[in-house]
């Protein structure tokens, strides 16, 4: 009995505990290690199909699009799931996927993807109002330099926060898009004297733009390419917004989108804005 007790005690001491949260499990009898299968790629193709590739064979246990679940079990490494319809350019789709590797853990993965914009316009940040009031709120003006669609373009003043995503809108070269950053506007679009359109969009962002030292970056899609950006500062000693500014500055400089000092915001008021083209675009 003493020998039996010693063997059981040795097994309890030296057997590693199993925790469902562990990403790696070791089989102490066969020395076989298993890890969760890794996601190699995940994308929307032709705006009607979700494709995903994993590092090894798994069993799909559940798949959902915008909360609509499909629990048909499928085995494989590469999968294509129809979205049920062709989504709009720039339209957001939330996808959840539950899969299990043979002998491994069950993994739940979430994706936020957007309908691909196949006719991208070219845009520039033309004016920025950073000291808005109730009657003249913060605004961002974009100038269209090439005709196309603005669906899925993203504007952000903080790389750690949710960006502003532009809706599907067909625009022509020379058109202007005025975005009321953290408010709603009821202004109607109109045609200027030169025949070009001015469009008004409600941003409804949670916070105003920083009125002292800040940045604004424009991407052509979610996690996409930087197409424009600005840095501005009143050159005060205040640390307010400094972390946000420095992260944006680093990204713009590393991508050759900014050189030298930021634009001075010292004399900006509610009616005096940061502008690219003196006197406007007309």
Model-identified regions with their sequence ranges:
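Buried hydrophobic-core signal for structured, non-transmembrane domains
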Residues: 50, 138-144, 214-218, 274
């Amino acid at each position: 009995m003493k020998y039996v007790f010693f063997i059981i005690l040795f097994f309890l001491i030296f057997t590693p505990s199993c925790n469902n949260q562990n990403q790696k499990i070791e089989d102490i009898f066969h020395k076989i290690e298993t890890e969760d299968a890794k996601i190699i790629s995940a994308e929307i193709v032709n705006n009607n199909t979700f494709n995903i590739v994993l590092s090894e064979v798994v069993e799909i246990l559940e798949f959902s699009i915008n909360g609509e679940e499909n629990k048909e079990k499928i085995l494989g490494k590469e999968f294509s799931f129809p979205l049920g319809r062709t989504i709009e350019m720039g339209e957001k789709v939330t996808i959840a996927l539950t899969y299990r590797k043979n002998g491994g853990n069950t993994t739940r993965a979430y994706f936020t993807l957007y309908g691909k914009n196949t006719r991208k316009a070219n845009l520039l940040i033309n004016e920025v109002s950073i000291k808005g009031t109730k009657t003249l709120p913060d605004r961002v003006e974009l100038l269209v330099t090439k005709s196309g669609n603005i669906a899925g373009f993203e504007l952000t003043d903080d790389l750690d926060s949710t960006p502003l995503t532009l809706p599907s809108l067909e625009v022509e070269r020379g058109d202007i898009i005025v975005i009321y950053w953290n408010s709603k506007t009821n202004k109607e679009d109109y045609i200027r004297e030169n025949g070009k359109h001015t469009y008004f969009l409600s941003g409804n962002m949670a916070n105003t733009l920083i009125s002292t030292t800040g940045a604004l970056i424009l991407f052509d899609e979610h996690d996409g390419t930087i197409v424009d950006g600005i840095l501005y500062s009143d050159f005060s000693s205040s640390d307010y917004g400094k972390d946000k500014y420095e992260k944006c500055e680093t990204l713009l400089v590393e991508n050759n989108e900014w050189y030298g000092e930021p634009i001075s915001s010292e004399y900006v008021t509610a009616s005096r804005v940061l502008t690219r083209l003196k006197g406007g675009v007309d």
